[in-house]
């Protein structure tokens, strides 16, 4: 077995103590790299897999950083970027941390290939699972890798689909697969207008969460501060009333554990 000191990942930053990245006080590790290019991304500097500001560190370094925070933490949450692109490398780290009684969470966009990531899923206690939306508007919202500047186009629903439908649907499919495994802590939806039908999506999520009342739905009203095209995105920000109405609709659909962030 390869030693932790011989496996390296690109690190964006570490927060030793955080109470917003899952249950209890946790250490949060932000890795570099994401296959998506979401227009509302507030950490676009983490999208490239390697940058001058990111450090290439060993798993042993990460393990030691986390262990320094014990006994003041319950576990660790690995975020990004998108942590599942490092799935093979994270498995030995999670095994080592769990052997010390720590829980291991993943903060994920949910667009990973489930079968390829199974070994990491097996050693992950919980997912903080992002829902990006649904339908062809996702192509513009999250999948236009050529739009490096993150400029919001005038036409957000594309006339032609360049992404395969199965890739667009992978988000919900992965959520449906993780729920029976008791692997989901919360589902998060960033709510913005016109890119997708938010009520229709919430209805689908309600069907999935029906038998999992302990899984929270977090509805987050998008904001433009810190995004790459603040002026362009501002036209798609829902009002407080619209956001509260979506939360009320989610409750009407049978979801009881809802957190609305305005």
UniProtKB/Swiss-Prot annotation:
Binds 1 [4Fe-4S] cluster. The cluster is coordinated with 3 cysteines and an exchangeable S-adenosyl-L-methionine. The keyword Membrane does not apply. The keyword Metal-binding applies. It catalyses: glycyl-[protein] + reduced [flavodoxin] + S-adenosyl-L-methionine = glycin-2-yl radical-[protein] + semiquinone [flavodoxin] + 5'-deoxyadenosine + L-methionine + H(+). Its EC number is 1.97.1.-. SUPFAM superfamilies: Radical SAM enzymes. Residues 20-262 form the Radical SAM core domain. One of its GO terms (molecular function) is 4 iron, 4 sulfur cluster binding. This is Putative glycyl-radical enzyme activating enzyme HI_0520.
